[in-house]
Amino acid sequence: MKLLMLCREPRLYSCQRLKEAAENSGHQMDILDPNRCLLKLSENSPHFELIYQATMEHEPSRLLNYDAVIPRFGSQSTKMGCAVLRHFEAQNIPCLNSATAFLQARDKWQSLQMLMAQGIAIPHSLLAGPEFQAPSTMQYVQSPTILKTLSGAQGIGVILAEKRQSAVSILETLKQADVSVLAQEFIEEANGADLRCFVIGERVVASMQRISQNGEFRANFHRGGLAEKVSLSEAEKTMAVKATKALGLDVAGVDLIRAKRGTLVLEVNASPGLEMIEKTSGIDIALQMIVHLEKKYQALQNVTKTIELRSHK
């Protein structure tokens, strides 16, 4: 297959591993920055065109004939990245996470609503409108409080407010900056640890426990967190797969936290990093992603052939 990966930083570990796994499996892979793409729609054939400008100095070139797409763009490229994904989806080219699913996962409040609608346990959470006063908001959540911007990854945009007044001040400041924030209960008994489950299709293929360090409450790799192998219960594996399905994702990093009342889903990541979890688990996740994409491509080919056969009868 000729594969396309949408990624702004091709030198990142995850992108390099996926390219390596694809090429070792006999595929060709291009890596393109979605922000350097021009999408063209035309009544004339071809109806969907992708034109790419590698640098400011390069002449734009038309790109054709990709068989499947892997999205790996960050939160700052979500809008254009999803527009490129839809361009391929409209041509029945399989994508390893659809644009719709990507957008749902990237909106933290919407994803929590969708998880709750499927009966999946999450921390108590609040989202107040811009005219709802911050002191009144804090009447409905206990301190300490976690405050999260509605988008962001790698622990960025997540704040721990130890006291009620601190939370009020932060909410008021962010409101002035026109930044929407959700408030969430702090799971103190987790002691700065959470679980990352890497889901592909209907299986948890790898997992790890992340542990915060040096007084930092966030356990993310990019915040200095450490990782260790962990055994998940069958209920936790089922929860991770159910959360992935709830958002319509093929591939996801599902973050769980063990609370006194049971395990909860913190959030679902549509473009989870590979480095920390591959090195901790010893599992070749990149290869499993390529294998899953091969199966998705073949399934779509079979459906297309069936439709063509029926149309000729």
Curated annotation (Swiss-Prot):
Binding residues for Mn(2+) 1, per the UniProt record? D255, E267
What is one cellular component GO term in this UniProt entry? cytoplasm
Where on this chain does Mg(2+) 2 bind? E267, N269
Q: Cofactors per UniProt? A: Mg(2+); Mn(2+)
Q: What is its EC number?
A: 6.3.2.-
Binding of Mg(2+) 1: at which residues? D255, E267
Q: Does the record bear Manganese in its keywords? A: yes
Q: Does the keyword Aminoacyl-tRNA synthetase feature in the UniProt annotation?
A: no
Q: Its Gene Ontology molecular function terms?
A: ATP binding; metal ion binding; ribosomal S6-glutamic acid ligase activity
Residues that coordinate or bind Mn(2+) 2? E267, N269
Q: Which domain of life is it from?
A: Bacteria
Please list the residues that bind ATP.
K148, E185, F186, D194, R218, A219, N220
Among InterPro entries, the record links this protein to: ATP-grasp, ATP-grasp_RimK-type, ATP_grasp_subdomain_1, RimK, Rimk_N, Rp_bS6_RimK/Lys_biosynth_LsyX
State the Pfam families in the record: RimK, Rimk_N
Q: Name one GO biological process term.
A: protein modification process
What does the record note about the cofactor?
A: Binds 2 magnesium or manganese ions per subunit.
Keywords for this protein: ATP-binding, Ligase, Magnesium, Manganese, Metal-binding, Nucleotide-binding, Protein biosynthesis
Q: Which family does it belong to?
A: Belongs to the RimK family.
Q: Which PANTHER family match?
A: RIBOSOMAL PROTEIN BS6--L-GLUTAMATE LIGASE, RIBOSOMAL PROTEIN S6 MODIFICATION PROTEIN
Report the protein name in the record.
Probable alpha-L-glutamate ligase
Which species does the entry assign this protein to? Answer: Pasteurella multocida (strain Pm70)
Q: What is the lineage of its organism?
A: Bacteria, Pseudomonadati, Pseudomonadota, Gammaproteobacteria, Pasteurellales
